[in-house]
Design a protein with these regions (language model features):
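Extracytoplasmic catalytic/substrate-binding loops of multi-pass membrane glycan-assembly enzymes
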Residues: 25-39, 47-71, 77-90
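Juxtamembrane membrane-water interface segments immediately following transmembrane helices
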Residues: 26-52, 228-339, 357
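Membrane-interface anchor segments at the N-terminal boundary of transmembrane helices
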Residues: 93-107, 359-468
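Transmembrane-helix motifs of polytopic, lipid-linked glycan transferases
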Residues: 101-126, 140, 159, 163
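Short acidic/glycine- and proline-prone juxtamembrane loop motifs at membrane-interface regions
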Residues: 146-156
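Membrane-interface transmembrane helices that cradle and orient dolichyl/undecaprenyl
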Residues: 164-180, 211-215
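Membrane-interface alpha helices of multi-pass inner-membrane proteins
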Residues: 179-194, 231-236
Length: 681
């Protein structure tokens, strides 16, 4: 079969990655899109070398409740250091010469191109349709198309990370012009956001070490790592030069909000340290931190019943006089909050090192599994309400914004919770299949014998996939620990996981027929370890046989939980009351577990026959007693647990309820429903 011409394949992939915008009728924007646009215009004016006297049109405001004059140029230099002018140039250029449809097309094309290079270098003999099929699955089954058409720099987290992987693992299969283009993508991704800079730089060093371990020559590793590091240096230098020019022209120094301060305060150790430090010096002498002036507000914010990442948002951005810190501070106080940030964070770590470490690891873990699309699903009408946002660039950036102006409504045609369920299924299946394929003999042995020395395809593919997964892990660490476990930070690049599976499927035979034997081998390994544990004199007496009825009953209970939770979340997403939804999901799970228990768990309990109706009635009665305990615990958890993520709330409630009813259900099933000598006809 002849290959589709690369340009035609890229154009088709670009259109597929814009599918969400086509369905919505417009690309999406965010509050920060305005700030990026303002900074982009300032960079353009800097290049044009406009006289400094023209810069009195930059009306500086100190807090969102105090705007001097409505203007689309409102900005505060103490916050705009976190908004890159280099992405702003791209955004404003799209606005000037096309619309943000042009920006969406460019971002989609760049994503399609980087994925194409991954596919071509990892699977050089694969048919062209496999590339388009992979893109199509990603477009409808992952978050990628929500971020390629989002007027924010988030998509470059994934594009930049993938570009680093290409340079490190596939550099010998790339043309010089392609390497130059990937280097430019890396540098651009780094200069537009500090989290991209940190993630890509960490990936360069960690990836270089991994590639050296699996056989790549030291010279090749050093050359490729240096190439990525040079992009990081150029990105840092470009940002520093602009900051200095900006200060010279305007008299203001670009700063950034104290994100890490807000993070350690929201996590808990920071607040405890703040109270101790401020109390010790309040008795005599100056207070050690500007933050001490706001410690009452911090205390009020941390007591608000919202998730941790939202607490840090309250500390930074709330306008309420009893909650906010940064947004209520004067300009000198904002400068002070920024300058004392590292000193405060170091003081917090010294004050409670274990608490800070534990909170950071928890934030990392939360970020790692935060895959839900949220900000790109905002209703554009939100940017057209009030007296401030309609004066910014946002109405001009939103295509056909008149249709969204209140009382109009142009919310995206996607249910966020249904979308989260769908993306979650795709991610779980992708992860399981990826782990299975990477653990097979060809990849495992090729990596073990340092197959990159001889250019073995399984080693090359395995190393590339490990690096792509490494992008996800490092991004979660950087964003979760330094800013907070916000869903957008991870969902913007979680699509790398299904893409990795698509690349593996294109490059290596999937051998689906070998999946069942592989599962059996893993089960045999677990069984062997379990029996060894049972042979130990101390713990063995507490462990039932792995193949016994209780363990099989637990496996069926796991299946029942999946059915229960799957039905529960689906119908809750459709608007059904949580209590009524649980009754329905329980009923479906009872039927499913009864069928599996009778044909597998208790299949050896045979005897005089009785009707299926009587057997099911007995099973339902036992399950109802277990469900009473299950339901009581579930209700207590969803209404009393300090968890504000609805899916996590449902998950914890279902897990706790299932555990509570397990023993009752097992004893009843064994001794009443499937007791020896009783079998249904």
């Amino acid at each position: 079969m002849r290959r589709i011409p690369p340009l035609l394949a890229l154009l088709a992939a670009t259109l597929l990655l814009m599918s969400v915008a086509f369905a919505d009728g417009r690309p999406t924007v965010f509050y920060d899109s305005h700030s990026y646009d303002v900074m982009g215009r300032d960079l353009i004016e800097t290049v044009q070398d406009w006289p400094a006297s023209n810069h009195n049109k930059y009306e500086r405001h100190l807090k969102m409740s105090d705007w001097p004059v409505p203007s689309d140029r409102l900005t505060d230099p103490q916050t705009e250091g976190a908004r890159s002018p280099f992405y702003g140039v791209l955004l404003h250029g799209a606005y000037l010469f096309t619309t943000i449809w042009g920006l969406a097309a460019l971002q989609s094309f760049l994503a399609a191109w980087v994925i194409y290079l991954l596919w071509r270098t990892m699977a050089p003999r694969a048919p062209s349709w496999s590339y388009l099929a992979m893109i199509a699955v990603a477009a409808v089954g992952t978050s990628i198309s929500f971020y390629t058409t989002f007027a924010m720099p988030d998509i470059f987290a994934g594009i930049g990370g993938a570009a680093v992987v290409l340079i490190l693992a596939q550099g010998d299969r790339l043309k010089k012009l392609e390497i130059a283009g990937l280097w430019a993508v890396c540098a651009y991704a780094m200069v537009i956001h500090k989290s991209h800079w940190a993630t890509e730089l960490l990936l360069a060093f960690a990836g270089g070490l991994l590639l050296w371990i699996v056989g790549l020559s030291t010279q090749s590793v050093v050359r490729r790592v240096v190439l990525v590091v040079s992009a990081a240096v150029v990105a840092w230098a470009a940002g520093a030069v602009f900051d200095q020019i900006y200060q010279n022209r305007t008299g203001y120094r670009l700063g950034h909000p104290p994100f890490i301060t807000a993070r350690v305060l929201a996590d808990g150790p920071g607040e405890a340290y703040m109270r101790q430090a401020c109390a010790q010096t309040a008795q005599g002498g100056a207070q050690p931190y500007v933050l001490c002036k706001f410690q009452t507000n911090v205390g009020h914010s941390t007591k608000v019943k919202v998730s941790g990442e939202l607490i840090s948002n309250l500390i930074l951005w709330s306008d309420k006089k009893t909650l906010g810190v940064f947004n209520l501070a004067s300009r000198p106080q904002r400068v002070g909050l920024e300058s004392e940030e590292m000193r405060f964070v170091v003081g917090t770590v010294k004050f409670d090192p274990l608490g800070t470490l534990g909170a950071s690891l928890w934030d990392w873990g939360q970020e790692l599994v935060a895959y839900q699309v949220d900000d790109p699903l905002r209703n554009p009408s939100a940017y057209l309400r009030g007296h401030y946002w309609p004066t910014t660039m946002l109405p001009k950036l939103i295509p056909n914004f008149q249709a969204c102006r209140p009382p109009g409504d142009c919310r995206p045609p996607f249910n966020d919770m249904v979308l989260a369920d769908w993306h979650g299924v795709v991610l779980v299946v992708s992860l399981l299949l990826l782990v299975w394929r990477m653990s097979l003999k060809d990849v495992r042995q090729s990596l073990w014998r340092r197959g990159l020395k001889t250019g073995e395809d399984p080693a090359r593919v395995g190393a590339s996939v490990l690096l792509l997964v490494g992008v996800l892990v490092l991004n979660a660490a950087v964003c979760g620990i330094l800013s907070g476990p916000f869903a957008r930070y991870q969902s913007r690049l979680i699509w790398l996981l299904p893409i990795s599976l698509g690349l593996v499927a294109s490059a290596l035979p999937m051998r689906i027929k070998g999946l069942a034997p592989w599962i059996k081998r893993r089960w045999d390994g677990v069984s062997d370890l379990w029996e060894r544990a049972r042979a130990q004199p101390v713990i063995g007496r507490f462990l039932p046989p792995l193949g016994g009825h209780f363990m099989r009953f637990c496996c069926v209970g796991g299946l029942g939980f999946i059915v229960d939770f799957g039905v529960l979340t689906t119908i809750v997403d459709l608007g059904v009351n949580k209590i009524a939804a649980r009754l329905l999901s329980f009923s479906v799970a009872v039927v499913a577990t009864w069928l599996v228990n009778r044909v597998w768990t208790f299949r050896d309990y045979d005897g005089p026959k009785r009707s299926l109706a009587r057997e099911f009635g007995s099973y339902l009665s036992v399950q109802s007693v277990g469900f009473a305990a299950n339901f009581a615990v579930y209700t207590a958890v969803i209404y009393a647990a300090p968890v504000h993520n609805e899916h996590l709330q449902l998950l914890l409630g279902s897990l706790a309820g299932t555990a509570a009813g397990l023993v009752i259900n097992y004893l009843g099933a064994k001794h009443l429903v499937f007791r020896r000598g009783v079998r249904a006809s």
